[in-house]
């Protein structure tokens, strides 16, 4: 069936919260329904399109702005976009949201206590941050501003990835006749 609805799912949270894990699972779930999806992962963007950016507050805001612009282009091309990046600042997320029509920007707060994220530390970044090697690391040397009213709030320390995906899927603006298996 023809896909009618496109939107962006914007996963935000500290490093190690589970954004990439959930983004990949969500993509699999939507792909299985025959929907056209595109995943914008923060690490991939930082190694490509945004490789010229550092980690100053201004550069972090620019990272979010560029990602929102790419997401908008992908939506215009008919894709459901899944963006997974820390995006630590409320004002920058708000500006990203403003690029999209009402109801097409679904903010997902991937919430985890900092100590849990540090214990997970899949990339070894928290250790480096605590040693001073990454002075502006989000959650340690730079603030992460929790979303005030995200469309979806999942807590990955208490909830399994599959339960988180089920919660996210319930909030997506999917047409009932789109991509039905």
Swiss-Prot record:
Q: Name one GO biological process term.
A: sulfate assimilation
Q: Which InterPro entries match?
A: APS_kinase, P-loop_NTPase
Q: List the disulfide bonds.
A: none
The catalytic site is made up of 87
Alphabetized, the UniProt keywords read: ATP-binding, Kinase, Nucleotide-binding, Phosphoprotein, Transferase
Entry binding sites for ATP: 13-20
Q: Is Cytoplasm a UniProt keyword of this protein?
A: no
A molecular function annotated in GO for this UniProt entry is: adenylylsulfate kinase activity
Gene3D superfamilies of this UniProt entry? Answer: P-loop containing nucleotide triphosphate hydrolases
Q: Which domain of life is it from?
A: Bacteria
Keyword Nucleotide-binding assigned:
yes
What's its EC? 2.7.1.25
> NCBIfam families from the entry?
apsK, PRK03846.1
Family recorded in the similarity comment: Belongs to the APS kinase family.
Summarize the protein's role.
Answer: Catalyzes the synthesis of activated sulfate.
HAMAP family attached to this UniProt entry: Adenylyl_sulf_kinase
Q: Mind telling me what this protein is named? A: Adenylyl-sulfate kinase
